[in-house]
Regions:
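Short, surface-exposed linear patches
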Residues: 10-13, 33-35, 55, 72-73, ...
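Structured segments of extracytoplasmic/periplasmic soluble domains
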Residues: 4-14, 20, 80-81, 100-114, ...
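Metallo-beta-lactamase
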Residues: 3-125, 129
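Repeat-unit-sized solenoid/scaffold elements
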Residues: 30, 81-83, 87, 135-139
């Protein structure tokens, strides 16, 4: 955050991200997108749609959708095909994450590109892969 802001780049964050970084003593983004506070909220910036589906892999998951290009930026709530586990769940809610992933599977069937938080970009199959990893973890 500090590096970006020192270059004159505005950093925007979910309200919970600001709270968590403050509590952790980390660099705090200076802009909060207050409209994303509630699960299910969406904010549009031109053709870009930012949305907060709720707690998942992290409590402050923010995702982005470019409908014209059908690209979903899922962040850490979407696992790459190389991932064989759900990863670190210390700051997340796996039950909510499963519900979010099921919703994403229904809502973004038209996605031609899905960008996970880590690993290779893929397509819609990353959403079903993520759902399977979570379901397997909960067994």
């Amino acid at each position: 955050v500090d590096v970006l802001e020192s270059k004159g780049i505005d950093v925007f964050a979910h309200p919970l991200t600001v709270q968590l970084t403050t509590e952790q003593g980390a660099a705090v983004p200076n802009n909060t997108i207050k409209e994303l506070k509630e699960a299910g909220s969406v904010v549009k910036f031109g053709s870009l749609e930012l949305f907060y589906p709720g707690a998942g892999h992290a409590m402050d998951n923010v995702m982005a959708w470019l409908p014209e290009k059908r690209i979903l930026f899922g962040g850490c709530a979407v696992r790459s095909l190389q991932s064989s586990s759900v990863g670190n769940l210390v700051h997340g809610d796996i039950h909510s994450w499963l519900n979010i992933t099921k919703q994403l599977n229904k809502q973004f069937k038209s996605a031609v590109m899905v960008v996970p938080g880590h690993g290779d970009v893929g397509g819609y199959e990353l959403l079903s892969h993520t759902e399977k990893l979570i379901s397997d973890h909960l067994k």
